[in-house]
């Protein structure tokens, strides 16, 4: 690795930066995620942003001869890009060392490393919700100065080609009550998931079901009608385990479509709204749906269980990440491969298709000693050319760029019934629907626990009042 002083284009510093199986790690780097407080290990770091050190004209080979270390978890995105890494090295002269960590251990390792301030890994895969945890203590670099520096960023990069909801979902100023889209650009979206409904189209056709329900009550009734316990067939699979990840896919998507919100801001404090009339009514219906049409072991379900049941032909519908179900329809991937379809799920009472998303992103370590080569890597990995090539492999869904979706992905996914139409229906209102706040993982896990308690017999209104009171207290500490 070249010394910082000897690398061209820098004055002195060059620093920066669940589907557990190959076929579909959905948003879920989330499955059994140990959450460490952002400030609980290690202190705040104040590493200077490295973008201003890069001068002169843009040149992909400006950091040639350097080496970067990146941290990833096995995932279809990672697998789609792995064969392309040699092209990055040929383009830039930068060598890339990849460390792969199993999803179950990934965020624990990353959290510990960032808190220690070692700068060992220059760039890493990051779920957008983790920005709210890793950003406030200064562990990740603001990438906006890099985007704005024409010496560091190719004029053809076209950041605005990335869907607006994704760009918004990776910005925040860390101020209580302020929405996403404010503050720094803490990561660059790389691949993402809309939480919508996948269904067994072959079985629907067999039953003569041609009209898919466009309101939640009809959706619940369809799920019940599809359920026959004697034939080991049930209507709807969703996550139900005692994890924050139970809330963010189908539950949160339909929750906001029905007009409920998680928090409001009164000018001073966030106020939890899980006990509002709309929230209570929706939650009662959601839990009733699990009892009458969900898996009998719903309280243990994470996304691999839900999508696995769809692929096996046990679940007739799944309300979860589209890119988690997409691979199940590929030849040989599941018993129901070729039989699946997608639709947005029921609209809200006012016809809205608000959708909660998960995005895998690339972020840079604020303590990296190799910031220019790390930025060149992030720029390449999220750029048009490499993303088009990655999508060609057939397991990369969904691309974050409009241009890649409109060309390569539309061609690759053309035979996936309803997938493209569903994507285009929801993309205009797909974003992180949660209110950003630094206690997200703790309070959202508490929400999942409350759902389990209601499933077990607790009164919904009183249990949600208790949850709201506790969460209001936690988020304002």
Curated annotation (Swiss-Prot):
InterPro entries, per database record: Bact_solute-bd_prot1, SBP, TAT_signal
Keyword list, A-Z: Signal, Sugar transport, Transport
A Pfam family this chain is assigned to: SBP_bac_1
PROSITE patterns with a match to the protein in the record: TAT
Up-regulation conditions: Up-regulated during growth on erythritol, D-threitol or L-threitol relative to growth on glycerol.
Record keyword Signal present: yes
Post-translational events: Predicted to be exported by the Tat system. The position of the signal peptide cleavage has not been experimentally proven.
GO molecular function: carbohydrate binding
GO biological process, one term: carbohydrate utilization
Free-text disruption phenotype from the record: Cells lacking this gene are defective for growth on erythritol or on L-threitol.
Superkingdom field: Bacteria
Signal peptide residues on this chain, from the entry's feature table: 1-38
PANTHER family: ABC TRANSPORTER PERIPLASMIC-BINDING PROTEIN YCJN-RELATED, ARABINOSE-BINDING PROTEIN-RELATED
Protein task: Part of an ABC transporter complex involved in erythritol/L-threitol import. Binds erythritol and L-threitol. Functions in the transport for the degradation pathways of erythritol and L-threitol, that allow M.smegmatis to grow on these compounds as the sole carbon source.
Stated family: Belongs to the bacterial solute-binding protein 1 family.
The name this protein goes by in its record: Erythritol/L-threitol-binding protein
Organism of origin: Mycolicibacterium smegmatis (strain ATCC 700084 / mc(2)155) (Mycobacterium smegmatis)
Taxonomic lineage from the root: Bacteria, Bacillati, Actinomycetota, Actinomycetes, Mycobacteriales
């Amino acid at each position: 690795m070249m010394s910082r002083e000897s690398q061209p284009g820098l004055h002195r510093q060059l620093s920066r930066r669940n589907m557990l199986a190959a076929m579909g790690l959905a948003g879920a780097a989330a499955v059994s995620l140990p959450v460490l407080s952002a400030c609980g290990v290690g202190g705040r770091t104040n590493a200077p942003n490295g973008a201003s050190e890069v001068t002169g004209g843009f040149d992909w080979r400006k950091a040639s001869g350097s080496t970067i270390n990146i941290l990833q978890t096995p995932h279809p995105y990672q697998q789609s890009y792995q064969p392309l890494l040699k092209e990055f090295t040929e383009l830039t002269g930068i060598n890339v060392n990849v460390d792969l960590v199993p999803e179950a251990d990934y965020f624990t390792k990353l959290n510990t490393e960032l808190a220690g301030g070692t700068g060992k890994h220059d760039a890493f895969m990051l779920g957008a919700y983790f920005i709210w945890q890793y950003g406030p203590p200064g562990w990740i670099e603001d990438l906006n100065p890099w985007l704005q520096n024409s010496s560091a960023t190719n004029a053809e990069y076209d950041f605005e080609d990335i869907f607006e909801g994704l760009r918004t979902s990776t910005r925040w100023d860390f101020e209580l009550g302020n929405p996403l889209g404010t503050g720094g650009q803490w990561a660059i979206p790389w691949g993402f998931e809309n939480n919508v409904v996948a269904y067994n189209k072959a079985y629907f056709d067999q039953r003569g079901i041609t009209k898919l329900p466009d309101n939640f009550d009809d959706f619940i009734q369809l799920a019940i009608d599809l359920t026959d316990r004697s034939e080991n067939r049930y209507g709807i699979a969703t996550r139900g385990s005692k994890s924050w990840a139970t809330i963010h896919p189908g539950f949160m998507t339909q929750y906001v479509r029905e007009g409920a919100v998680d928090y409001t801001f009164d000018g001073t404090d966030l106020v939890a709204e899980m006990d509002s009339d709309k929230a209570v009514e929706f939650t009662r219906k959601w839990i009733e749906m699990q009892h009458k049409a969900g898996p009998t072991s719903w309280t243990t379900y994470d996304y691999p269980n839900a999508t696995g049941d769809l692929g096996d032909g046990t679940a007739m519908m799944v309300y979860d990440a589209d890119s988690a179900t997409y691979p199940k329809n590929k030849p040989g991937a599941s018993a129901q491969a070729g039989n699946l379809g997608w639709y947005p799920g029921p609209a809200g009472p006012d016809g809205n298709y608000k959708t909660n998303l998960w995005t895998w992103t690339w972020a840079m370590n604020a303590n990296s000693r190799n910031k220019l080569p790390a930025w060149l890597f992030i720029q390449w990995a999220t750029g048009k050319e490499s993303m088009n090539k990655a999508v060609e492999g057939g397991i990369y869904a969904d691309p974050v760029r409009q241009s890649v979706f409109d060309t390569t992905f539309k061609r690759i996914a053309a035979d996936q019934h309803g997938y493209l139409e569903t994507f285009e229906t929801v993309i205009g209102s797909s974003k992180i629907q949660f209110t950003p706040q630094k206690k997200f993982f703790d309070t959202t896990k508490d929400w999942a626990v409350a759902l389990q308690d209601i499933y077990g017999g607790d009164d919904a209104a009183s249990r949600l009042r208790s949850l709201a009171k506790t969460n209001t207290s936690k988020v304002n500490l």
